[in-house]
Amino acid sequence: MSSKRAKAKTTKKRPQRATSNVFAMFDQSQIQEFKEAFNMIDQNRDGFIDKEDLHDMLASMGKNPTDEYLEGMMSEAPGPINFTMFLTMFGEKLNGTDPEDVIRNAFACFDEEASGFIHEDHLRELLTTMGDRFTDEEVDEMYREAPIDKKGNFNYVEFTRILKHGAKDKDD
């Protein structure tokens, strides 16, 4: 009997349970969006995000991440990343430390000059052709209140601030 117990302990490490009800932190539509994002990253469809899934997802976006970079991303999780752990990690990021960095860094991946701007046409192309694709109408909606200068440059640093803190009043 004890040999069976010893054998069971050598199997794959099980994901840790979330300590709080992470599903109560988000509404149904947000949870659905997170599920779609999780499924996009879980390239091999095994219900867990691993280093290979991250590599394949980033490669599909034209990136060539180093092993060290991927290890750094994976080390943020205390164990295997199933959907509940994924949601917990996002909940901690959104409600804890500064999520502005995360949002800004997502845009910065496509800002080759590190200027804080992405041309609106290029961003529209990215949003409508990659990942969870936006429709042209959704991009138009996003651009309606977005900080875009006369040359068509989308200021993602300011946009990130607006997302997190709201737009400044016109009177300011």
Swiss-Prot record:
Pfam families: EF-hand_7. Keywords: Acetylation, Calcium, Metal-binding, Motor protein, Muscle protein, Myosin, Repeat. Residues 1-20 are annotated as: Disordered. InterPro entries: EF-hand-dom_pair (IPR011992), EF_Hand_1_Ca_BS (IPR018247), EF_hand_dom (IPR002048), Myosin_RLC (IPR050403). Ca(2+) binds at residues 42, 44, 46, 53. GO terms for cellular component: cytoplasm; muscle myosin complex; myofibril; myosin II complex; stress fiber. PROSITE patterns: EF_HAND_1 (PS00018), EF_HAND_2 (PS50222). GO terms for molecular function: calcium ion binding; myosin heavy chain binding; myosin II binding; structural constituent of muscle. GO terms for biological process: myofibril assembly. The modification N-acetylserine is found at residue 2. Residues 1-16 have a biased composition (Basic residues). Residues 29-64, 98-133, 134-169 form the EF-hand domain. Myosin regulatory subunit that plays an important role in regulation of both smooth muscle and nonmuscle cell contractile activity. Implicated in cytokinesis, receptor capping, and cell locomotion. Myosin is a hexamer of 2 heavy chains and 4 light chains. PANTHER family: MYOSIN REGULATORY LIGHT CHAIN 2 (PTHR23049). This chain binds calcium. This is Myosin regulatory light chain 2, smooth muscle major isoform. It comes from Gallus gallus (Chicken).
